[in-house]
């Protein structure tokens, strides 16, 4: 009898927990994905803050020349970063228990792996949680599809690119100037500016900003008057009201006359689908481009494409970019190798004495 009661009580506790996790009445929805999301994002955040403030220098290139990234070792908010794990570690999984000591783990950049792995699991489960809440509320599932674009971009720079390059030391540093350094080195080694997928991403981000500004300004300029001149226009809208708060016909007529008729949407649903899809597709392409460049399928190379009748090169913009790439490649990791990899790969000319 006692055993039966205990089983029933434990079952009740589990059922209460399940109903609480999946309840849409909570102020913040937890969900089954949230059960994994919350601890992983908390772990990543706490470790990131501690490492950004106090982590000792990391031997990022694996040549016994540690690079300081934390505030306590002389950096500021702009220059500080969680430095990627050492090239000596490569792609090895490097949790704390794999190191001989905590000092060794810190020296080899262990916190970087801890942060990015927990962060990636956290954003994957956040995306799953978006789907889960949409499902519970009977909504369509496109919110998590839109969120998949930044998730794909983060996965590309933190996971796919290091795998393709053979070391987590090539991952993006977790800091402001570290991000810029990553971008410059990426351009030097992969010519990303000449990759069509990156061009699509630029069109997605800049175009999305333009369309967002256009839509916001058109709506704001065609609001239905509900207030006096002395009141804020925002008081003219009541949350949940059934009536349209702006005149889409007026906005359509304005923009159709400003450009031409068919450049203006006359359907609010197709308009908002377009506003969501444009930047998402662009960022998907950029993530795809970074993931292919990870395995050295690089941007277009039009260097020295034009020559005159005497065989002399007529420089184009591609040649200017190439010279800049070589200069950037020479300067980064300057103690790890003496020449850019492009130059080092060429056989030395034979000298006949």
From Swiss-Prot:
Cross-referenced InterPro entries: D1/D2 (IPR055266), Photo_II_D1/D2_sf (IPR036854), Photo_RC_L/M (IPR000484), Photo_RC_L/M_CS (IPR055265), PSII_D1 (IPR005867)
Further remarks about this protein from its record: Cyanobacteria usually contain more than 2 copies of the psbA gene.
Organism listed in the record: Trichodesmium erythraeum (strain IMS101)
Modification after translation: Tyr-161 forms a radical intermediate that is referred to as redox-active TyrZ, YZ or Y-Z. C-terminally processed by CtpA; processing is essential to allow assembly of the oxygen-evolving complex and thus photosynthetic growth.
Binding site for [CaMn4O5] cluster: 170, 189, 332-333, 342, 344
Record site: Stabilizes free radical intermediate: 190
Positions that bind Fe cation: 215, 272
The protein's name: Photosystem II protein D1 1
Membrane topology: Multi-pass membrane protein
Entry's EC annotation: 1.10.3.9
First-listed, main subcellular location of the protein, grouped into a coarse class: membrane
Catalytic activity: 2 a plastoquinone + 4 hnu + 2 H2O = 2 a plastoquinol + O2
An MF annotation (GO) of this entry: oxygen evolving activity
One GO term describing the cellular component: plasma membrane-derived thylakoid membrane
Signal peptide: none
Keywords: Calcium, Chlorophyll, Chromophore, Electron transport, Herbicide resistance, Iron, Magnesium, Manganese, Membrane, Metal-binding, Oxidoreductase, Photosynthesis, Photosystem II, Thylakoid, Transmembrane, Transmembrane helix, Transport
Annotated residues for binding of chlorophyll a ChlzD1: 118
